[in-house]
């Protein structure tokens, strides 16, 4: 029983796909570091994340998938669902092995279906966040919003709020993942510290 273990990053998963073809192995399990190995598993292959290998795999996907298919992969990854690792890995491997055009549209494939459904869950939540996020004004004039979404949707909603509130400073902070994005009126930057400072002195 072949097992691959990776660092639970998207580059790590793409590197695992590269290793699968390079080693000519199709693992029955793709596990994140820290996951329990199944009984009777062979010595696991530990994937060493390689950005160049990951980039090669992604460029290959760009040749075989539509924009919708690439979108499915990118967005579903933001779900942070551990159960997605295996079907997403399987789906990407099938893209290269089968060379079926628009494989991402084959809803009868269980791996494709799982990736597609995960993508839909993330997109549904990001839409809900856009509709229901509410800001509070801090003493320094910054508008603050704290969210705790099930999925890592913050990267998907930032452009929306930059377009909508482009004339005032604001910070949207994900309390579950301990990071946020700060807009100073001209540019957006990722922030881990600004919220804690505002929370202590301004609110």
Question: Where do the PLM segments sit?
Answer:
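N-terminal ordered "arm"
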Residues: 1-51
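Short, hydrophobic/amphipathic alpha-helical patches that form generic packing surfaces
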Residues: 12-23, 90-94, 159-163
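Residue-level marker of positions within ordered structural domains that often coincide
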Residues: 23, 166, 199
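Charged, alpha-helical interface segments at or near domain boundaries
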Residues: 31-127
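Internal, well-folded beta-alpha domain core
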Residues: 101-190
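Conserved small/polar residues in nucleotide/adenosyl-binding loops
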Residues: 193-199
